[in-house]
Structure formats: structure tokens, C-alpha cells
Design a protein with these regions (language model features):
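Structural marker of alpha-solenoid helical repeat scaffolds
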Residues: 52-55, 89, 123
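Short, conserved micro-motifs composed of acidic
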Residues: 72, 99, 106-112, 116-429, ...
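Periplasmic OmpA-like peptidoglycan-binding domain that tethers envelope proteins to the cell wall
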Residues: 351, 356-358, 559-660
Length: 660
């Protein structure tokens, strides 16, 4: 009995040991798949293991790994649930919450992401991932609120239900050929990628026909294999074709290389490995310098800054040099991928490490005078909450394509971007200054610094109608509004240095010629008539009115208070009126256009609605001697000050300027 008992225990122990060994073996296999970046395959293997694990802590660790697989494969929504479970573990909370925050960013929920990053920092103040993630999320919110002229829309002629990415254009004067990568159903391979769980990507092309319509998308069967091809780069006016091709054995990714194909009788033929690195290494995403002597690409190679870097290789006859790193001007400890060289001084790429709006962002680098690259995040709308990469920019136009899995995408989609020309407009109304009534049939003349002139009589029959003019860029404008019986209206503005569309809106208020206008704040010393410097500065605005209305003849009148004799006040006011006209003459206004008249105290002021600022001086009050005597001493001084004034009145509007 004891022998049987011991034998049974031994068999159970051996069985448990065998099960544990089998599970450990499967776990190692799943870990190896993950290390090989076969994330979808690893996810399936971890999921199978999870069902057989009883230990709670081990289950949570596997849940976290499943979340990582989904995240790295781009299935962010599916990654949320396993990360939430892992976040309950003290040991995994920080990593899991950081991932959850990154998922919220991918979904465009920046405020939720900010909350999660802050929760991590409350527990671990020096966590680099949370600190940089928080900075990026806050920066992204700012970017969405900045104005932009760029229009971006999905390139429906290139997109399918699968992943479509990395376009390259053979620019042919309106008959563009667009080459791109896709995992669509028509892709050649029958097996599924261990990385994404989708079909392997192939190369495809479509082109504009002579009617301006896109032809059906076709696969490049001469270059496609059973495995991944992608990231095309057209060069030499459509005669050379660079692309990435990857091989796999027994379902395992064996790395990627850059190939070059030649166009023969209209077909891409003779694909050849450039041989930049050995087959044991992996490189991809080629772009070529304008002279064809450099190939830039992305790779994880020894001597880099961490993650994937941008490297280049130089052509030596029929071979290519060993890779050289582009340096810290471009590369970081994160991933730099998908380079595109537009010209010798403009270089695009995507990065995860510079402050981004989420995942990969597109950056542009300009070569400065010191030979160094200066990088800038292209901001919204080039970048978004998702991964943005694979940009192609037309050589001589502000338009192109990019790839994104932003909101509204079905996986990775290709988007078309354009920068429409700046639009500037002038619009507005013309009203009577006093009555605020619409002034109909005004003549508006618009003068541009480029020598242009537009003139139109504007009919404004009701409050909803406005005058409208289209304007040019980088131009200074003066517009003049004229109407019989009114002073001319004038204003200046410029479209120079403006980077965004703008409508200049003006409500032009014209002042009637049939009224006396007080020139405010013209002050004289007691009993004197010489103009003070502040008074001259005020009179300059009236000089401008005379210049802008060259046909008017005016009376410039001076008035005094009632202190002193009638005779002395009359003489003083005449001298003051003469001082004003003399000043106008010194500014170039002909004497024939002015009449100086001193009225002394004979025309006391009548308070208008504009002057009724004192409760003891209501509108309509005449400031004569009897009224002033009825006021207190302090109030009398105010009333006397109101009577001391310079006024302007239009006598005629038919003056003909001299031709001299």
C-alpha cells in the first residue's frame, strides 16, 4: 500500500513538473516571438498560455505582455483591457498606466491621458515616460488650437479596408503615378504577418488618366513576393525604383533590405539588393538624395542613439558604403523612421521621441549655414493623435501625401495635403457719422502699393449688404470713400507678412460737409494767439482732412469766452484764427482754400450730444452770458472753457487745385 502511495505521488509530481516545463517552454517561445517583433504571433501564444496559468501574479504579468503585443501591433483598443488589469498590480502599475495614457492619446483623449500621466508621477516623480508623455500631451492640445492654412483629406483613391501607406509619386505633368504599400486583399502572399496578423504588404500603383481620373489600383507583380515589400522611392525621373523587401523563413521574419529596380519597356524589372548591410541585419524606408549618390534609410544598427535611427550610405561606383549615422541633429534615443529628402536642404522624417502629438510625428529638418540640420515638428494637421509618417512632398508645389492612423482612419490610410493660396478680402459698410444711416452709392477707390487701382460705386440698399474687394498678398493698400455732401473717408492696411487668410472689415463713417466741426483741445495762453506745440499736433489731423479732401474751401473760426470787452475779444479771436490758417499754409494748404474769421464772444456755444458730459450743461444749452452767470464759480469756468474754441466749416466743395 505504501509503495503504491509513493508511486502515485511520484507520478503526480512528474506530471506537474512536465506541465510546468511545457508551460515554461511555451512562454520562452512567446517571449522569443515578441523579441523578434512578431507581436501578433506572440499575442496568440501568450493568450494560449494565459488559459492554463492559475497563479494570479503570473496571470497579470501575461496580461501585461498581451497588452504590449496589441499595442506594438497597433491594436490600441484591444490593448486597453489587459493593461487595465495589469495596472492593478503594484509592480506593473506604472508601466501599465503609462501605456493606458498613450492609448488615450492615440484615441485623441488628451485630457484623460494627462490625468493618467499625473497619477503615475504622484507615485514615481522621476518617471521619464510619464514626464515626457505629459509634456507631449499638453503640447498637443496647444497644437490643435493653433490656426493653420493646410487642408488634409483622405486620399480615397488609394485607401482600402486594409493598411495603405508610404506613397511615392512619379511626377509627370498632370499624369502622376502614385506608388504605395498596402496589405489589401490583392497582396500576393497567402500567409499572415506575425507582426500585425494581416497580410504581408505589397507594392501597388495607380495613375491619372488623360481625363484627370485615377485608374484602378494595380499590384507591381514584377517586384512583389510572398512577404513584405513597401516604402517605395521613385528616382531619376521615374527610371529607378528603390524599395524595402523583407524575407521570412518558416513564418519568421528574417530581416529587410533595400532594393533597386529599373524600368524596362514600361515594367519594373531586375530588382537588386544594394548590399548596404549584411543579410543578418535589417534596414528599410529608403529615400535618395537629388544627385542619386546617397541613400537615406532607417535601421537599428550598432553605434546608433537607441531605437531606430536615420542612416545614409554613399555610392562608390557600383557599390554602396557602410552606413553612417545622421547624428543627434536628427536621431534620438527613440525611433526615427520613414525619411524623405525633398531637396538638398529639406529633409522629412518621423520620430517618437521629440515632443509629439501621439505616436510617430512628422518632422522637417532644414540644413543651416553651419551644415547642421535643424528639426521642427510640423504640428497639426500634419500630425495628430495617431501615428503620422511616410510623407511625400511634391518638388515644386505645396502639396503631397502622408500616412496616418488618426481618427477616421481604417487602420493606416493615405492622406492628401494641400496649402491653398492666401485669400484676403476687404468688406464693409458706409454710414453717416451722426445719423448712422446707410450712405448709398458711395464711390470706393482702392490703391495698391503694386500700382493697382480698383474703383467701384457701391450700392448699399440695406443692412445686410456690404462692399467687397479681393486683395493681393504682400501689398499695402489705401482705400478712399467719397460721396457728395460728405468729407472723404480714408483708411490704410496691409497684407504684407500675413500668413493666414483674413477679411478686413470696416464700418466707414462719413461726416457731413453741412455742419460746423469743432477742433478740440486747441489751447492758447491767456490773452495770446500763438499756437502751442500740443495744439499744432492736434491741428495736423485737420491738415490731413484738407489733403484728403482737395476740393473743399473752409472757414476757420475762433471764439472766445465772455471775459473782457467785446472789442478785445473780437481782435484776439481774429489773431487766433489767423494763427491757425498760417499754420495750415506752412503745411502746404493753399491760402485760397481757407478763410480766417474771428467771432469773439458773439457766437456762444450750443451744447451738442457729444459735449453733454456735465450734468449742468445739458444738450441744447446755449452758453450765453445770462446762463453762465446762473452757474457756480467752478461751473462758470467749465462753461467759459467750452466757449473758447476753434471751429471749421465747409464753405464750398468746388475748389480746383493748381497744376503748378
Amino acid at each position: 500500500m505504501n509503495v503504491l502511495k509513493h508511486t502515485t505521488i511520484l507520478l503526480v509530481m512528474l506530471l506537474i513538473s512536465g506541465i510546468m516545463c511545457a508551460q515554461e517552454k511555451k512562454l520562452r517561445k512567446a517571449d522569443e516571438s515578441f523579441e523578434a517583433e512578431e507581436y501578433y504571433k506572440a499575442m496568440e501564444e501568450y493568450t494560449a498560455i494565459l488559459k492554463k496559468i492559475k497563479d494570479k501574479n503570473e496571470k497579470i504579468e501575461i496580461q501585461y505582455k498581451i497588452g504590449e503585443c496589441y499595442f506594438m501591433a497597433g491594436y490600441y483598443k484591444k490593448a486597453r483591457s489587459p493593461f487595465k488589469r495589469a495596472a492593478k498590480s503594484k509592480g506593473l502599475m506604472v508601466k501599465a498606466k503609462n501605456r493606458l495614457a498613450e492609448i488615450e492619446i492615440q484615441e485623441g483623449n488628451y485630457e484623460t491621458a494627462i490625468e493618467l500621466f499625473n497619477e503615475v508621477l504622484e507615485v514615481k516623480k522621476d518617471d521619464t515616460v510619464a514626464r515626457e508623455g505629459l509634456k507631449s500631451a499638453q503640447w498637443a492640445v496647444e497644437q490643435y488650437n493653433l490656426p493653420t492654412r493646410w487642408n488634409i483629406e483622405k486620399a480615397k483613391h488609394l485607401c482600402s479596408k486594409a493598411n495603405d501607406f508610404c506613397p511615392s509619386i512619379d511626377e509627370k505633368d498632370g499624369f502622376d503615378h502614385v506608388y504605395f504599400s498596402s496589405t489589401r486583399e490583392e497582396a500576393k502572399g497567402k500567409k499572415l504577418s506575425g507582426i500585425t496578423g494581416t497580410k504581408f504588404s505589397d507594392l501597388f500603383v495607380t495613375k491619372l488618366d488623360r481625363h484627370g481620373k485615377w485608374e484602378d489600383v494595380a499590384a507591381l507583380d514584377s517586384l512583389n513576393t510572398q512577404f513584405d515589400e513597401g516604402s517605395p522611392c521613385i528616382f531619376d525621373q521615374g527610371r529607378k525604383f528603390y524599395y524595402t523587401s523583407c524575407i521570412a523563413e518558416r513564418g519568421k521574419n528574417m530581416g529587410c533590405q533595400i532594393y533597386e529596380a529599373q524600368k524596362v519597356d514600361g515594367e519594373w524589372m531586375n530588382p537588386a539588393n544594394l548590399g548596404i548591410v549584411s543579410d543578418s541585419l535589417s534596414i528599410g524606408h529608403p529615400t535618395v538624395s537629388p544627385d542619386g549618390n546617397r541613400v537615406y534609410f532607417s535601421a537599428r544598427l550598432q553605434g546608433g542613439f537607441g531605437g531606430a535611427d536615420i542612416w545614409y550610405s554613399e555610392k562608390n561606383g557600383s557599390t554602396w558604403s557602410a552606413p553612417k549615422n545622421m547624428g543627434s541633429w536628427i536621431n534620438t534615443e527613440g525611433d526615427e523612421l520613414f525619411p524623405f529628402m525633398r531637396n538638398d536642404t529639406t529633409f522629412f522624417y518621423s520620430s517618437t521621441k521629440h515632443p509629439t502629438m501621439g505616436g510617430l510625428d512628422i518632422f522637417v529638418a532644414y540644413l543651416n549655414e553651419d551644415g547642421h540640420w535643424e528639426s521642427h515638428n510640423m504640428g497639426y494637421p500634419f500630425n495628430s493623435n495617431g501615428n503620422d509618417f511616410g510623407i511625400y512632398y511634391y518638388q515644386n508645389e505645396d502639396k503631397g501625401y502622408l500616412t496616418s492612423d488618426r481618427k477616421g482612419s481604417k487602420g493606416e490610410d493615405i492622406y492628401f495635403f494641400t496649402k491653398p493660396p492666401l485669400e484676403f478680402k476687404l468688406k464693409g459698410m458706409v454710414h453717416d457719422l451722426d445719423t448712422k444711416a446707410i450712405i448709398d452709392s458711395s464711390l470706393i477707390t482702392l490703391y495698391g502699393s503694386d500700382g493697382s487701382m480698383f474703383r467701384d460705386t457701391i450700392i448699399l440698399a440695406n443692412k445686410k449688404e456690404t462692399f467687397n474687394f479681393k486683395l493681393k498678398t504682400k501689398t499695402d493698400y489705401v482705400f478712399v470713400v467719397t460721396k457728395d455732401g460728405y468729407f472723404n473717408g480714408k483708411s490704410r492696411f496691409t497684407t504684407d507678412s500675413l500668413e493666414f487668410n483674413k477679411t478686413f472689415e470696416y464700418d466707414i463713417l462719413l461726416e457731413s460737409l453741412n455742419k460746423t466741426i469743432e477742433i478740440p483741445n486747441i489751447e492758447f495762453a491767456f490773452g495770446r494767439w500763438e499756437l502751442t506745440e500740443p495744439s499744432k499736433a492736434i491741428l495736423d489731423s485737420t491738415v490731413r482732412i484738407m489733403i484728403e479732401n482737395p476740393h473743399i474751401v473752409i472757414e476757420l473760426s475762433a471764439h472766445t469766452d465772455m471775459i473782457g470787452s467785446d472789442q478785445s475779444n473780437m481782435e484776439l479771436s481774429q489773431k487766433r484764427a489767423n494763427s491757425v490758417t498760417s499754420y495750415f499754409e506752412s503745411k502746404g494748404i493753399p491760402a485760397a482754400r481757407m478763410v480766417a474769421k474771428g467771432y469773439g464772444e458773439s457766437k456762444p456755444k450750443v451744447i451738442t450730444k457729444y459735449d453733454a458730459t456735465y450734468p449742468f450743461l445739458p444738450k441744447g444749452t446755449t452758453l450765453n452770458e445770462d446762463f453762465i452767470k446762473s452757474l457756480s464759480k467752478e461751473e462758470q469756468e467749465v462753461a467759459n472753457q467750452q466757449n473758447r474754441r476753434i471751429e471749421m466749416r465747409v464753405l464750398s466743395n468746388d475748389y480746383v487745385p493748381s497744376l503748378d
